[in-house]
Regions:
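Eukaryotic intrinsically disordered, low-complexity regulatory linkers and tails enriched in Ser/Thr/Pro
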Residues: 1-99
């Protein structure tokens, strides 16, 4: 199997050093992520969710609690090759092996 064949699929990945991922909100030792691509530096994976809470208006003034809101941001993050411990793909598993 080649990585090119599973781009766009959901894979299982465990990290050698999960502390390196904490700065971007990934706190788990392992998880399931959509593989978006790869390069000489590592794997590009879809971030499971970044939420930003808007607490100020456009002028920097605090918003009342009932006007504050959350925004979900789409993001892709990199796992360097030296931080990949294990990787697993699920051929033909519904919801994981995507066309």
């Amino acid at each position: 199997m080649r990585l090119d064949d599973i781009i766009g699929d959901v894979i299982f990945l465990s990290f050698k050093n999960p502390e390196r991922m904490q700065a971007i909100g990934i706190k788990e030792l392992s998880g399931h992520y959509m593989l978006k691509g790869y390069d000489q530096m590592g794997l590009w994976l879809e971030h499971p969710g970044i939420k930003i809470q808007h607490m100020e208006d456009e002028n920097g003034r605090p918003l009342p609690a009932d006007q504050q809101f959350h925004e979900e941001i789409d993001a892709v993050f990199m796992v360097h090759w030296d931080n990949v411990d294990n990787m697993m793909h699920y051929p033909k598993r519904k919801g994981f092996d995507l066309p």
